[in-house]
Amino acid sequence: MDNKLDVFRRELVDVEGIPLFWSIAEHWSQVESFEARPDDILISTYPKSGTTWVSEILDLIYNNGDAEKCKRDAIYKRVPFMELIIPGITNGVEMLNNMPSPRIVKTHLPVQLLPSSFWKNDCKIIYVARNAKDVVVSYYYFYQMAKIHPEPGTWEEFLEKFMAGQVSFGPWYDHVKSWWEKRKEYRILYLFYEDMKENPKCEIQKILKFLEKDIPEEILNKILYHSSFSVMKENPSANYTTMMKEEMDHSVSPFMRKGISGDWKNQFTVAQYEKFEEDYVKKMEDSTLKFRSEI
């Protein structure tokens, strides 16, 4: 493609019933055949659930809390987004293939689309889930500034699309539920964004235990500090400001917008809230998963 702008604001394309960016669908065979390595750590999330936060925490852990080492490159190069392939711009599969082990890998794929090599290699997986109402609000603003997405339309229209699962990476409801079930069979640490906001130290300790890493308190405190929202928001290697404006327009909405729980209350009308809740109960009643919508 000669014109890089041709890749933006295009409609999503279904892969096995899941709407994905057209460019991922076009290069699906490359994603599907991705070769995981046994010492890979996979960060899996539905979009806007704390992916970049956990990516930065893991990179800090792997570098013993050395924040300068973690500024060696942008977060999307340190922790490549495996399935993201945009012709002429990025290829997550190729980036990862060229990376030395141990690799930290990012994905937003629903459990049924994850390349089988992750299961075959019994890779450790950290899944982060965030309450649906905060996700949809954050996703709406992200759609506006990250132009690989189709146009979001109005808030009302986007909310309807989200409830119908007609957004990139499909329905939030199925995503969080199926990964929750999968944790019974594989090495998956399932974390909640709200718990991380409430007590980040405790959640980082869970991650360390899962990774079988023991670090001194002093380094843990460094990791806590450098992975805090206020510090990451000002860190160009963590806040995505190094991306081209054509890809992400931070003047529309910053990538790191608020980083709080309960912001949905500033966006939903009472009628939207009631409709969303009624639909939510139906979609989630078959799961033992419980979310907090504020802390």
Curated annotation (Swiss-Prot):
Gene3D superfamilies listed in its UniProt record: P-loop containing nucleotide triphosphate hydrolases (3.40.50.300)
Expression (tissue specificity): Detected in kidney and liver. Detected in kidney collecting duct cells.
This protein's name: Sulfotransferase 1 family member D1
GO molecular function: aryl sulfotransferase activity; sulfotransferase activity
Record key words, sorted: Catecholamine metabolism, Cytoplasm, Lipid metabolism, Transferase
Function: Sulfotransferase with broad substrate specificity that utilizes 3'-phospho-5'-adenylyl sulfate (PAPS) as sulfonate donor to catalyze the sulfate conjugation of catecholamines, such as dopamine, prostaglandins, leukotriene E4, drugs and xenobiotic compounds. Has sulfotransferase activity towards p-nitrophenol, 2-naphthylamine and minoxidil (in vitro). Sulfonation increases the water solubility of most compounds, and therefore their renal excretion, but it can also result in bioactivation to form active metabolites.
Gene, per the UniProt record: Sult1d1
Disulfide bonds: none
Any one of the GO CC terms: cytoplasm
Pfam families documented for this protein: Sulfotransfer_1
Enzyme Commission number(s) of this protein: 2.8.2.-
Active site residues per record: H108
Family: Belongs to the sulfotransferase 1 family.
InterPro entries on file: P-loop_NTPase (IPR027417), Sulfotransferase_dom (IPR000863)
Binding positions for 3'-phosphoadenylyl sulfate per the UniProt entry: 48-53, 130, 138, 193, 227-232, 257-259
BP GO annotations: catecholamine metabolic process; lipid metabolic process; sulfate assimilation; sulfation
Signal peptide (from-to): none
EC supergroup of this enzyme: transferase
Residues reported to bind substrate: F81, K106, T107, H108, F142
Record's note on what induces expression: Up-regulated in liver and kidney by dexamethasone, a glucocorticoid analog.
Cellular compartments annotated: Cytoplasm
Coiled coil: none
